[in-house]
Amino acid sequence: MELTPREKDKLLIFTAALLAERRKARGLKLNYPEAVALITAAIMEGARDGRTVAELMHEGTTVLTREDVMDGIAEMIPEIQVEATFPDGTKLVTVHHPIV
């Protein structure tokens, strides 16, 4: 199987998000890479499902709360930008203050 660098990146994000999801389900607080991966994967999947950029900008703020992450992590992530593939092409989704 041959994958482009972009496809490899998507697979890596998905794998990290899956790990983060499992750790969160066990009650563990997420670290920086886990939090970013989980939010990023949610945005990418939402785009694939056909949601709009505006919907995903809002949805990105509902994936995690401060209680889900280690101390100081929310402040380390002022925004997340994701180039997501929508049915009509690739668009940049920016989520400001993703962890409230």
Swiss-Prot record:
A GO biological process held by the record: urea catabolic process
UniProt keyword Chloroplast present: no
SUPFAM superfamilies the UniProt entry points to: Urease, gamma-subunit (SSF54111)
A GO molecular function held by the record: nickel cation binding
GO cellular component terms listed in the entry, alphabetical order: cytoplasm
Keywords: Cytoplasm, Hydrolase
Pathway noted in the entry: Nitrogen metabolism; urea degradation; CO(2) and NH(3) from urea (urease route): step 1/1
Alphabetized NCBIfam families for the sequence: PRK13241.1, urease_gam
Protein's recorded name: Urease subunit gamma
Species of origin: Cupriavidus taiwanensis (strain DSM 17343 / BCRC 17206 / CCUG 44338 / CIP 107171 / LMG 19424 / R1)
Lineage of source species: Bacteria, Pseudomonadati, Pseudomonadota, Betaproteobacteria, Burkholderiales
